[in-house]
Amino acid sequence: MDKLVVNGGNPLFGSVEIGGAKNAAVAILPAAIMASEGISVIDNIPDIQDIQRLERIITSLGCKVKRVQNTVEIDSTNLTSVNADTEDGSKMRASYYLIGALLGRFGKAKVELPGGCPIGVRPIDQHIKGFEALGATVKISHGTVEAQADKLIGTNIYFDVVSVGATINLMLASVFAEGTTVLENAAKEPHIVDVANFLNSMGANIKGAGTDVIRIAGVEKLKGCNYSVIPDQIEAATYMIATAACGGCVTIKNVIPKHLESISAKLIEMGADIKEGDDYVTIESHKNLKGVNIKTLPYPGFPTDAQQPMSTLLSISQGRSIVNESIWESRLKHVDELKKMGANIKVEGTVAIIDGVEKLTGANVKATDLRAGAAMVIAALAAEGVSEISCIEHIDRGYPHIEDKFKELGANIRREKI
């Protein structure tokens, strides 16, 4: 196991290249196995643990998978197995996309109940409701989900709550369904649009992605295609927030600025300077930022995945800030770690009341989940003194080469074996 050792206090300067969106890539790889002809060549795939696990799972199903740097080739023409009941699947949330993909292509699927970050109850009831509405029978037993259908028939599906995962999974399952499927109260995140665009590039007929009503007209088959995944808005947000916390000036390259509007708006409100280009964002910060209130919401609102990094920044900003985590009820576990470094934060349910302190002090802390890990890296970079961050396997699930990228910006950070 590894840990990160950070000697904080350095401002950040330079530029950083953002990789492909984790949340898009972990759905696009399962989508690729739905092609019965041709090879999919997918560019801008991040080199992170969740992707490596998915590559192993779909290889075990009979696909041929080849990675060259950030490009992954998938040949699913000889895929025969529908049993994705693997240990890798139990360690990541996105393994559930294999249910929709396999059910859509073969009419049956067997997948290990998904794992991922311990940030609260993450039920798949909306997924199951949708699969059953299409005509599938779904059973959950001994940690495994099994779905089966003689034929999937398009229908209208209304999500009781806005769910990114259910929206994507039902898009996958509906691609081959007879007739038209309408998803109402659908999530609108950029990676949902990206998955729909990928499926359409393979021959699907999906309209309305990015709105709250998505229509999928069933097609007979999909063919492999060439595609490039959108940039990762949360990775970009992490480097923006880190620059604001440490001070300095950093250009974040290979981004879609529109996807970062909710982040940029809050950082500007706090006092940071932000300039946007077609595919970059430059942030300049002299620290001494003022606190703000945030509430996490589905896109285009403030993203829950950026809440924990932003909480770190607010802990060293002037005045009081209120953070309302409205998406996941257990996504404030990082607060106890920030307190070890001197943060003044009180948690009431899913609300954090943050009174900014002048500085944080280095300490031994742990990454309790993926985005909490990013929050602790930012805290350590901004703190006075040395910090050690353990449990960084969570960080590796979503941030490629995080220590190398921060080193390039002038941070004193290194990875060590425990």
UniProtKB/Swiss-Prot annotation:
It is found in: Cytoplasm. The active site is at residue 117. It is an enzyme of class 2 (transferase). The keyword Metal-binding does not apply. Keywords: Cell cycle, Cell division, Cell shape, Cell wall biogenesis/degradation, Cytoplasm, Peptidoglycan synthesis, Pyruvate, Transferase. Pfam families: EPSP_synthase. It comes from the Bacteria. One of its GO terms (molecular function) is UDP-N-acetylglucosamine 1-carboxyvinyltransferase activity. Pathway: Cell wall biogenesis; peptidoglycan biosynthesis. SUPFAM superfamilies: EPT/RTPC-like. The modification 2-(S-cysteinyl)pyruvic acid O-phosphothioketal is found at residue 117. UDP-N-acetyl-alpha-D-glucosamine binds at residues 93, 122-126, 305, 327. Its EC number is 2.5.1.7. Phosphoenolpyruvate binds at residues 22-23. The keyword Cell cycle applies. One of its GO terms (biological process) is UDP-N-acetylgalactosamine biosynthetic process. GO terms for cellular component: cytoplasm. It catalyses: phosphoenolpyruvate + UDP-N-acetyl-alpha-D-glucosamine = UDP-N-acetyl-3-O-(1-carboxyvinyl)-alpha-D-glucosamine + phosphate. Its main location: cytoplasm. InterPro entries: Enolpyruvate_Tfrase_dom, Enolpyruvate_Tfrase_sf, MurA_subfamily, RNA3'P_cycl/enolpyr_Trfase_a/b, UDP_GlcNAc_COvinyl_MurA. NCBIfam families: murA, PRK09369.1, PRK12830.1. Belongs to the EPSP synthase family. MurA subfamily. Cell wall formation. Adds enolpyruvyl to UDP-N-acetylglucosamine. This is UDP-N-acetylglucosamine 1-carboxyvinyltransferase 2. The gene is murA2.
